[in-house]
Design a protein with these regions (language model features):
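Alpha-helix capping/helix-boundary segments
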Residues: 21, 61, 91, 110-111, ...
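Acidic catalytic patch
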Residues: 61, 81-102
Length: 145
């Protein structure tokens, strides 16, 4: 009865991107571009092998990074099928709570809300300390760019 630990193994893993990860993916001249692309390729490879993994970016992070999906300068990153996590009422309330408790930026607070809503989380970030703060004790995998 109920869910045992083995039943959760099939649940989806999400890779969340922070502002610099989004910018690094988009700009081949960015010093962290190759590292960011290599992590994105791992996710694409896992999808191809039918392993449940997705890459996502909270809307507030996308805005902070200046990512306009309609701009041709973002064509490469658009091909990676990175999902947007909307700042809907539920996420907005959760993000406001994270921001009030931790005093981080709005974008980092939205990342914290996304972390709280997901089961297995990897965060690709330039600031591992901030991600540990916004995770508020939840176990996450942090990959530093």
């Amino acid at each position: 009865m109920g869910r045992g630990p083995d039943e959760r193994r099939g649940m989806s893993r999400v890779i969340l991107l922070d502002n610099e990860a989004v910018q690094a993916l988009a700009d081949p001249a960015h010093p962290k571009h190759l590292r960011a692309v290599s992590h994105a390729q791992v996710a694409v490879t896992r999808k191809a092998r039918a392993l449940p993994v997705s890459i996502a970016v909270p809307a507030a992070v996308r805005v902070e990074a200046g990512r306009d999906r309609t701009s041709s300068s973002w064509a490469f990153i658009n091909r990676l099928r990175i999902a947007d996590i909307p700042l809907d009422p539920g996420h907005a309330n959760a993000a406001a709570g994270v921001r009030n408790r931790t005093r981080v930026s709005v974008a980092d607070a939205h990342l914290g809300a996304a972390i709280g809503a997901a089961y297995q989380v990897t965060v690709l970030t330039s600031d591992p300390l901030d991600m540990s703060v916004v995770a508020e004790g939840k176990h996450i995998e942090v990959v530093a760019l």
